[in-house]
Amino acid sequence: MEKEVIVVGAGLAGSEAAYQLAKRGIKVKLYEMKAKQKTPAHSKDYYSELVCSNSLGSDSLENASGLMKEELRILGSMLIEVADRNRVPAGQALAVDRDGFSEEITKILKNMENIEIIEEEFTEIPEDKIVIIASGPLTSNKLFEKISEITGEESLYFYDAAAPIVTFESINMDIAYFQSRYGKGDGEYINCPMNKEEYYNFYNELIKAERAELKNFEKEKLFDACMPIEKIAMSGEKTMTFGPLKPKGLINPKTDKMDYAVVQLRQDDKEGKLYNIVGFQTNLKFGEQKRVFSMIPGLENAEFVRYGVMHRNTFINSTKLLDKTLKLKNKDNVYFAGQITGGEGYVTAIATGMYAAINVANRLNGEKEFVLEDISEIGAIVNYITEEKKKFQPMGANFGIIRSLDENIRDKKEKYRRLSQRAIEYLKKSIKGV
C-alpha cells in the first residue's frame, strides 16, 4: 500500500494524527474544509480550534485527564507540547491561550515537510489509500453519507443522550440494594429507594434546577428519541414514578416492602466498577447534576465519572466497528480518531489521533501494531470504545475504566497516584520503537 495517508479534519485528533505520520516519514494529505465551509461550532480558520472551554483539564496525576496528558507527553504529542507553551494561569489545570494554541498548531502543520493541506470538503473514501477519519461531531452531510455506506446506518448516532455514570465504590450499599425487577435476571441492577418525602424533595429540586443552554445547531432533533429526566418531571409530579423511578416489581430487602420510588443503576463496564443511572438523560448543568442527583438515597457521596449530556454529537458505534488499532474491522484502509469514535473531551481526541497515527505509520513501515493495555489511561479509553457492549455511549478519561490495582487502597488520592505511577511505568516499557 502506498506510503501516503489521507487525514480528514484538522481538529485536535486530525492535527495530532497528521503530525505523527509526517514525523515518521509518511506523506499526508490533510483535508480541512473550514477555510471555505465552516461547521456551526467553528468561527476561525485556525486548526485545532477549541470551541468550548480553553481548559484541557487537570494536570495532576491524581486526575485521569492529568495522567492521559502525561502519557501523551511521554509519547511525544505535538499538541500537548504546544498547549504547555501556551499555558495560562489556571491552578492545576492546563488552560491555554486558545488563539495562541491554535495559531501555533496551524503554523507547524502548514510548514511541515510531508504534509499537504487540502482546503476542501472530503467526500469520497478511496480504496487504495489509508484514510484516518477525524471529522468530529459535526461531520459534513456528504461525508456522513459515505460513512453510513461503509459502516451501516444503524451504527451511527446523531446526538448524545447519555445518563450520568458513577463509580460503584462511591454508592452507599447500606441504603442501596441489588435486585432485578420482578425477580427476573440475576439482580443486575442497583436500586436506590425513596420514601414519599425523599421523592418530593428530589422532584422539587429537579424541576427548578438550572439547565445548560443549547446551541442553535443542537436544537433541531435533540429530543426526538430521548426525553430528559427533568422534562419528564415537569410533565407531572408523579410521572417519574410511572417511568424511570417506578417501584413496581421491586421489594426492598431491608424493609420487605415496595418503596414509593426507586432509582435504578445499571452496570456500565465489564469489571463492574462503573454504573449508569438508568433513564437519567439530562440537560442540567454539571454542577446541578451533582447537587440534585446526590439527593438520591445511596448516591449522597457518589463520584461522577461522567455527567449526563444531551447534544448533537455524531459518533460511530466503535465497540461494534473498530479493532484495537482504531481500524474498521470490515474495511482494511479506514481508521477513525477523535470525537467521532465516541471518545469524549479534548485530551481523548488528541490521544486517539496519536494512537491511530502510530498504528498506521507502524503498518506502512512494516512494524508491529501499537496496542496499549488498559493499564494506561490511553489504553483504557481505547479499550472502552472498542470493547463490545450492549449500549455504547461516549466516554472521556477517568480512573473508573483503568485496570484495578492488585491491592485495595482506601485513600482515593493515594490510589489514583498509584494507578498513575503504574501507568507511566508500563507506558515507558511499551514505547520501544514507537
Give the location of each predicted region.
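A glycine-rich dinucleotide-binding beta-alpha-beta segment and adjacent secondary-structure elements
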Residues: I277-G343, I350-T352, F370-T386, F392-N398, ...
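C-terminal auxiliary extensions adjacent to catalytic cores
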Residues: M395-V434
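Beta1/beta-strand and adjacent pyrophosphate-binding region of the FAD-binding site
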Residues: E2-A13
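Predominantly flavin-linked oxidoreductase catalytic cores and closely associated redox partners
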Residues: N111-E271, Y275-F286, K290-R291
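Redox-cofactor binding/interface segments in oxidoreductases and associated redox assembly factors
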Residues: V8, I132-A134, F336
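Internal hydrophobic alpha-helix adjacent to the cofactor/substrate pocket in enzyme cavities
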Residues: I350-F370
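A conserved beta-strand/loop capping segment in the N-terminal third of enzymes
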Residues: S60-T106, K110
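N-terminal FAD cofactor-binding segment of flavoenzymes
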Residues: Y19-E81, D374-I378, V382
